[in-house]
Amino acid sequence: MEIGSNLKRLRTNEGLTQTQLAQKLNISRVNYTRYETNASRPDYETLVAVADFYDISLDELFGRA
């Protein structure tokens, strides 16, 4: 499973739009969309920010837990 599908699942479970989440993470919506569609991979800092936002581990973010 690619990380993009996990990102989308987490976001939609929270009832957030891509724009809302991108603003909370201080990244552009375009970049966030690329992460969800697996067109681009988030850097480590972004991954940590996402995991912190959802209060999950990086393993959970990658679907390993």
Regions found by a protein language model. Give the residues of each.
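Short basic helix-loop element that most often maps to the first helix and adjoining turn
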Residues: 5-24, 49
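DNA major-groove recognition helix of helix-turn-helix/homeodomain DNA-binding modules
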Residues: 45-60
